[in-house]
Amino acid sequence: MLRMPFYALCSRFLTWSGLLLLVASLATGVSGCNNSDDENTQPVPTVRLETNATLGAHLVDQQGNSIYYFARDLAGTNTCTGGCASVWPIFYEPNLVLGEGLKAEDFATITTTNGKPQTTYKGWPMYYYAPVDAAGQNVREKAGDALGENVGGVWYVMKPDYNVLVARATVLHKTTNQITSKVFLIDSQGRTLYTFDRDRTNPTTLPSNCTGNCVATWPVYLEPGRVLTSNLRSSDFGVIIRTDGLNGATRQQTTYKGMPLYYYSPDGAQRNKVEGDGIGNIWSVATP
């Protein structure tokens, strides 16, 4: 019988061992690649931005369903109850995963009057739209639709970059003491905007009748951009140049339909404060 030399056996053993090690190494590498892919898989956003040809970028859920705000919810609580709640179901997401352009600190959770949790965005409760169909049933609109926009003049898609919005609230007129429900302009933080009747009735060589001590009580408003709810027209907004800036410099002030816009200092720069309507019977909330 032919015998193989010892050194040849060792050589062959080492060769097969090397091959086995190579195969094991490749298998480990492939397995490692698969694990890496799994680890790098990003979760699908549960709230993201979607761009509409007419409305621009607005908030939608994971399936692309539009999300709305209610102009009556200025105080940050859900005021859509009864039959309203059937048409405008609440949006609630306990495990928020946000798409690009959205910030976690802008979202929170509230509890409605019937004990249900609801997600809010920048202080506004979030809703879907479910109009009544031909069979008399409330059916949520399809993904990609935004048919709830401007319904009743108080429902609008949620956007991350509104500069001027509309709110609806009961307002006390400080001269007549009458309380009425009004739709009025607010800034991106929910602060009320006002107009000065004398800017309309008393022509002046200055762009505004409110100067000196007046402007300390009624600070000027300047919008940083022109993203508006759809019931407002960009062409209705403009800018005037004032000469009472810091150290005598000029500064700008936003106008709406030719009327300069102001804040009211006693509102404390707070959301849902409307203390200036009817002051002196010459100041009013800015209405669309």
Predicted feature descriptions by range:
Residues 77-109, 150-159, 207-240, 280-286:
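A low-complexity, Ser/Thr/Gly/Pro-enriched, surface-exposed linker/loop concept
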Residues 2, 22-50:
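Bacterial Sec-dependent N-terminal signal peptides
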Residues 76, 109, 113-166, 260, ...:
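Hydrophobic, ordered structural segments
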Residues 10-23:
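Sec-dependent N-terminal signal peptides
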Residues 48-66, 111-125, 134, 164-192, ...:
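Short, low-complexity cationic-aromatic patches
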Residues 37-41, 46-120:
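Ordered, small/hydrophobic-rich secondary-structure cores
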Residues 72-76, 96, 131-136, 197-202, ...:
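Acidic glycine-/aspartate-rich tracts in secreted/extracellular proteins
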Residues 1-13:
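N-terminal secretory signal peptides that target proteins for export/translocation
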